[in-house]
Amino acid sequence: AKKEAEKAEKLRAAGVQPQKKKAVGSKFFNDLAGLMGDEFMKRGATLHGCDVRTRDAFANMDIAGYNYGIYRYKHDLKKYPNRLILGSETFCNDAYRFREQAKKNPRLVGDFVWAGMDYLGEVGVGSWEYKAYATQFSGLGWTTAGSGRIDLNGRPLGEALYTRVALEQEIGPYIAVRPVMFSGEKHSPSAWKMTDAMPSWSWAGCEGKKAHIEVYARAAKVALLLNGKKVAEKQLKNDCLAKFTIPYQSGTLEAVSYDAIDRVLGRCKLQTAGADTVLRAVPEEKKTKPGRLCYIRIRYTDRAGELKPMERGMVNITVSGGKLLAAGSACPFHPGSYLTPETDTYYGEALAVVEAGES
């Protein structure tokens, strides 16, 4: 692998584009799903051959694991009355549907959304990336899948909030906003990405642009307020997600969720960051011991600590009293190294991993 990487780097330095290999096996189907959408995978799982190939094996298993089998659950639970089913790999946008089915049938024992956290490999399969962060939508430079509900640096995204509400760990509401500065721009295709929304209302310079807002709530309806004024309201049916599009205006964005008789169930607010910008180093733990790993978030914020996702810059990291082991952003397109002290930021943030020293 090292020799292949060195060869590819030499070709790139010489301006030679490597030959694109034909996708086969899992990569072929992943690429096809990226182009055709998640229905391709879910409809494929309902083909008769899938049942024929698995029924004998499942008859000898304690639990049958289904990949993208949301459309098979109801049928198979009836056809195989002794079968326990686990969603071993599923799409994020099916989490609500799974939960509603599982409440009606306890033989649906669990669901694993792919993927909980981003990871190295299967590069770009779950990424919605824009040209500002990815100079090309395929080829060299991609390092992670981009399909995590939690990004590579450990930051929960809008999809993580949606999943928590869908699986009834919380009732919400939560607000997440798609990057307003990229509104209307094309992004890399993926079936494994439900949304690129994040919990932020800090989009400086985007006044008047379309803001695509998502509210996640277990409720009968949700209302959206901007700077104290109600600007939209939606009923929630067959999902815990309401989508709104309004012109961006800085200030306070609030979501209020209601039950069927208009009682308030919850509130959530996002506040625009102030005009001042500060680069902060924020350790996850205030105290540590020699030899322990310290994860330090490097963030562009205002003076109150509110993240500013539109701020971007190259950061050079120096460490005293410890050893820098790695540094990088969560961007799936990362043509550089995680082993150097210099890193770009991604939506206002990067991460440094430091081994604590004796002092």
Question: For the regions a protein language model found, what residue spans apply to each?
Answer:
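Substrate-binding clefts and catalytic carboxylate motifs of secreted carbohydrate-active enzymes
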Residues: 2-291, 303-307
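Short hydrophobic/aromatic beta-strand micro-patches
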Residues: 216, 353-355
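Aromatic sugar-binding surface patches on proteins
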Residues: 236-242, 334-351
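Surface-exposed, short loops/turns at beta-strand junctions within beta-sandwich domains
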Residues: 245-251, 346, 355-359
